[in-house]
């Protein structure tokens, strides 16, 4: 940094009275500001700032963000070279000032032709730890994590939907603060760290987005997880209706989780208090209020650019509900960001899914599917192709069928055939949209391959290319069930051979 820039930073410190300290790859301005008494501001007061020019520093940035109100702390992420990393966090003293910063400064032209992005920062204290042995218990995982990292408060482990004595190959580790979690991630992220002889995978667990109290006050749907695969919707309706017969409007079960819709909120809250922790069919269940999906999604401008919250519509009543997913895979919840059953979890994987300009003269290099990272695949169809390719299997064939649904709708369903394995898979749901039917069929195939492969397939984040297993996940596509009328081939559709779509005759279905 040149002397003029240092002088500008010193002048800023003199004007404001704030201190400035650089540590752990970030430079902290303030925190607390002069004269501040009491604890730091609670959650919801911090904004994330992305797309900052790399040669811009606090002397230019702080005055811009002061327009929105009193700043408690400004944290600029720094490179070893002295340049910033393109993003920062600004904590205000009140929620209103943070919201004002978003309104005023999102897409603000910070320099000619340079626009920054500003959005709510989610104070993350959880890490996702993948590729752990499936026979390890919560206590063992917590003990090991406390040995290698500081500030561990809790470990969240979910049992396999197939074998409740095993975990799903991943865990969530809760730390006492975002700083403690960041330090732990920094220590574990290189990819060479091992637990029990396994190279573990580490990433941020995407924090649950806060919803306004007014929205949550209208929710009358319960989210139930940790169910046995054999538990039926009828069993759930009976169990949740015990306190008040007739209070349950409908039940939608998707593998080992379900949504219980009540006619009114009071009955839902009563059932929540009574049923949380209850054992159904030998499995202790977890019950929470279902969270409506936010209207603005999970847009963010960080180094990963986008955090894609997974939502699912259809069959869930008055509004969409947030499928809180993370790299876990279960039949109904192949989750956002290579996830699935973390439907039960308040997290989703963040994928680099922003669009960038294709510059004239750019060099194009042919690549094969082997060179693509699993984290770059966001659909079950792509992941199934990837999985087959990695295992030297034939690529999946999609056989398309139709049936007459309710109200005369034409329903679509795919059967997935993997010839080299002599196996075929068909989901138990049908769709009205062709692409959804294909995605659902691929999800179902991935789920069944996971169930049948035992420990050979780990359902945690994408593993290094040299590892002996593959993890995967994709967006969840729950659909209302329709009576299975006689299935027949649909009308011909135009498609390229590359799509490998098959419109079979009736006999091939049997």
From Swiss-Prot:
An example molecular function term from Gene Ontology annotations: mRNA binding
Disruption phenotype: TALEN-mediated rbm46 gene inactivation leads to female-male sex reversal during the sex determination stage and infertility with failure of spermatogenesis. The testis of mutant males have germ cells that are almost morphologically identical to spermatogonia or are spermatogonia-like but exhibit almost complete absence of germ cells beyond the spermatogonial stage. Oocytes fail to progress through meiosis to develop juvenile ovaries.
Any Gene Ontology biological process: spermatogenesis
Ranges for domain RRM: 45-123, 125-207, 220-292
Residue ranges, compositional bias (Pro residues): 31-42
Chief place where the protein resides: cytoplasm
UniProt-listed Pfam families: DND1_DSRM, RRM_1
Segments of this protein annotated with the region Disordered: 23-42
Subcellular location as annotated: Cytoplasm
Keywords associated with the record: Cytoplasm, Differentiation, Meiosis, Oogenesis, Repeat, RNA-binding, Spermatogenesis
Alphabetized InterPro entries for the sequence: HnRNP_R/Q_splicing_fac, Nucleotide-bd_a/b_plait_sf, RBD_domain_sf, RBM46_RRM1, RBM46_RRM2, RRM_dom
Stated role: Essential for male and female fertility, playing a crucial role in regulating germ cell development by ensuring the proper progression of meiosis prophase I.
Designated name of the protein: Probable RNA-binding protein 46
Source organism (scientific name): Danio rerio (Zebrafish)
Upper taxonomic lineage: Eukaryota, Metazoa, Chordata, Craniata, Vertebrata
Gene: rbm46
């Amino acid at each position: 940094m040149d002397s003029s820039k240092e002088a500008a930073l010193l002048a800023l410190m003199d004007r404001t009275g704030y201190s400035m300290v650089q540590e752990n790859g970030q430079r902290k301005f303030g925190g607390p500001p002069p004269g501040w008494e009491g604890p730091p501001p609670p959650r919801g007061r911090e904004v994330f700032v992305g797309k900052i020019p790399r040669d811009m520093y606090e002397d230019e940035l702080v005055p811009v963000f002061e327009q929105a109100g009193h700043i408690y702390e400004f944290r600029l992420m720094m490179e070893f070279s002295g340049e910033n990393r393109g993003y920062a966090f600004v904590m205000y003293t009140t929620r209103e000032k943070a919201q004002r910063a978003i309104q005023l400064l999102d897409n603000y032209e910070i320099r000619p032709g340079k626009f920054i992005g500003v959005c709510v920062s989610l104070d993350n204290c959880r890490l996702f730890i993948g590729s752990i042995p499936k026979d390890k218990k919560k206590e063992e995982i917590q003990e090991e994590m406390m040995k290698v990292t500081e500030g561990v408060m809790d470990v969240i482990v979910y049992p396999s939907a197939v074998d409740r004595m095993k975990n799903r190959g991943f865990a969530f580790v809760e730390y006492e603060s975002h700083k403690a979690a960041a330090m732990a991630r920094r220590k574990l992220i290189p990819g060479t760290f091992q637990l029990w002889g396994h190279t573990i995978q580490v990433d941020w667990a995407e924090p649950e987005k806060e919803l306004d109290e007014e929205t949550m006050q209208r929710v009358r749907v319960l989210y139930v997880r940790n169910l046995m695969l054999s538990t039926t919707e009828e069993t759930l309706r009976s169990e949740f209706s015990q306190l008040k017969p007739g209070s349950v409007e409908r039940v939608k079960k998707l593998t080992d989780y379900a949504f219980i819709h009540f006619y009114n909120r009071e009955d839902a809250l009563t059932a929540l208090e009574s049923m949380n922790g209850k054992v159904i069919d030998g499995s202790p269940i977890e019950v929470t209020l279902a969270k409506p999906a936010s209207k603005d999604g999970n847009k963010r401008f960080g180094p990963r650019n986008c955090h894609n919250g997974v939502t699912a519509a259809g069959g869930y009543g008055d509004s969409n509900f947030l499928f809180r997913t993370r790299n876990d895979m279960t039949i109904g919840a192949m989750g956002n960001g290579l996830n699935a059953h973390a439907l039960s979890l308040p997290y989703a994987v963040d994928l680099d899914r922003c669009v960038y300009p294709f510059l004239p003269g750019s060099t194009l290099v042919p690549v094969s599917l082997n060179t693509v990272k699993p984290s770059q695949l966001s659909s079950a169809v792509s992941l199934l192709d990837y999985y087959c390719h990695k295992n030297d299997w034939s690529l999946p064939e999609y056989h398309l069928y139709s049936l007459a649904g309710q109200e005369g709708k034409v329903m679509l369903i795919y059967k997935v055939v993997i010839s080299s394995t002599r196996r075929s898979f068909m989901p138990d749901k049908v769709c009205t949209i062709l692409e959804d039917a294909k995605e659902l069929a691929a999800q179902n195939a991935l789920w069944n391959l996971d169930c049948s492969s035992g420990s050979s397939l780990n359902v945690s984040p994408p593993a290094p290319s040299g590892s002996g297993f593959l993890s995967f996940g994709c967006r969840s596509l729950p659909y209302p069930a329709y009576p299975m009328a006689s299935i027949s081939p649909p009308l011909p559709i135009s498609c390229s051979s590359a799509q490998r779509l098959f419109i079979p005759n009736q006999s091939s279905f049997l």
